[in-house]
Amino acid sequence: MSHILDKIETVYPFPPKPIPLSQEEKADYIERIKKLLKEKDAVLIAHYYTDPEIQALAEETGGFVGDSLEMAKFGNRHPASTLIIGGVRFMGESAKILTPEKRILMPTLEAECSLDLGCPADKFSEFCDAHPDHTVVVYANTSAAVKARADWVVTSSIALDIVEHLDAEDKPIIWGPDRHLGSYIAKKTGADMLLWHAECVVHDEFSADALRKMKNVYPDAAILVHPESPASVVELADAVGSTSQLIKAAKELPQQQMIVATDKGIFFKMQQLVPEKELIEAPTAGAGATCRSCAHCPWMAMNGLKAIEKALSEGGAEHEIFVDEALRVKSLIPLNRMLDFAEQLNMQVKGNA
């Protein structure tokens, strides 16, 4: 059983799209970035939702492409003293939480996440204080301050197991911040959950009606859906899962066409694994409606070559991530609780968004 809070009105100030670079400019920035990575003892770590050229550069230079938790864990293990995180701000914070001794740079600190923006730490903490009998479970797509208020931090692949574990102990749960993922988990587990009311601007736009029409055009296609999508979209899926799980599903499912309902940045890695298959963007918005994100996170798009070069060459307060040490230690507790639980289950934690 789930109870959804009244919607908190949050205005998401979408950033302007980066000015496109010419091929010559791209080549120049790529060469400069490669040189700077060596000079600064740095490694580029990119999320699946960044632009393909950023993911390609990360792989070419010995970096990494993955989900947010995989990114933080890779950075923790890598010998480089500086990590440049291609993603959104909470991902840089996660890297700093797990690897405090390293310098964490981001192309821009203005790369936000609507789930993070939709869950202000002060308001969320007040709500938690009003329900002291509830166990607080938060999605990884949150600020360090929200993580510090939680009992558990979860990723989408382990969330069901953790909620089932808590439900077996008859513990009521506060879930934040993604209402769609929370509803999906509540439906699957039957747990008593109070859901914070925020959503991912990308996944919230996927339309069940439009998806049905697309399925009519591609009747043999499999539908892959991230659980941050509305329930009506999830119900149409052949496979539901996190970014890493969807990539795995694309490889394992027999269909040769895949309709993919998540950020289209994922196509870069997915196509690498299934070059023989046709990947199709799931439709956003509805009939006559205009999409806002259009299946690509506007903040992820801020991680351009120019911004990466500037972060490496200039650094400074506009690019470096700092997390208060007391807050870092506190937020590490629920994160380690998840990692320990996953180890007990003998499973590999694969991440969120």
Curated annotation (Swiss-Prot):
Binds 1 [4Fe-4S] cluster per subunit. Its EC number is 2.5.1.72. It catalyses: iminosuccinate + dihydroxyacetone phosphate = quinolinate + phosphate + 2 H2O + H(+). One of its GO terms (molecular function) is metal ion binding. Iminosuccinate binds at H47, S68, Y139, A140, N141, S156, H226, P227, E228, T243. It holds the Pfam family NadA. It comes from the Bacteria. GO terms for biological process: 'de novo' NAD biosynthetic process from L-aspartate. Pathway: Cofactor biosynthesis; NAD(+) biosynthesis; quinolinate from iminoaspartate: step 1/1. Its main location: cytoplasm. GO terms for cellular component: cytosol. Its cofactor is [4Fe-4S] cluster. It is an enzyme of class 2 (transferase). Coiled coil: none annotated. [4Fe-4S] cluster binds at C113, C200, C297. Keywords: 4Fe-4S, Cytoplasm, Iron, Iron-sulfur, Metal-binding, Pyridine nucleotide biosynthesis, Transferase. InterPro entries: NadA, NadA_sf, Quinolinate_synth_A_type1. NCBIfam families: nadA (TIGR00550), PRK09375.1-1 (NF006877), PRK09375.1-2 (NF006878). Catalyzes the condensation of iminoaspartate with dihydroxyacetone phosphate to form quinolinate. HAMAP family: NadA_type1. Belongs to the quinolinate synthase family. Type 1 subfamily. PANTHER family: QUINOLINATE SYNTHASE, CHLOROPLASTIC (PTHR30573:SF0), QUINOLINATE SYNTHETASE A (PTHR30573). This is Quinolinate synthase. It comes from Vibrio campbellii (strain ATCC BAA-1116). The gene is nadA.
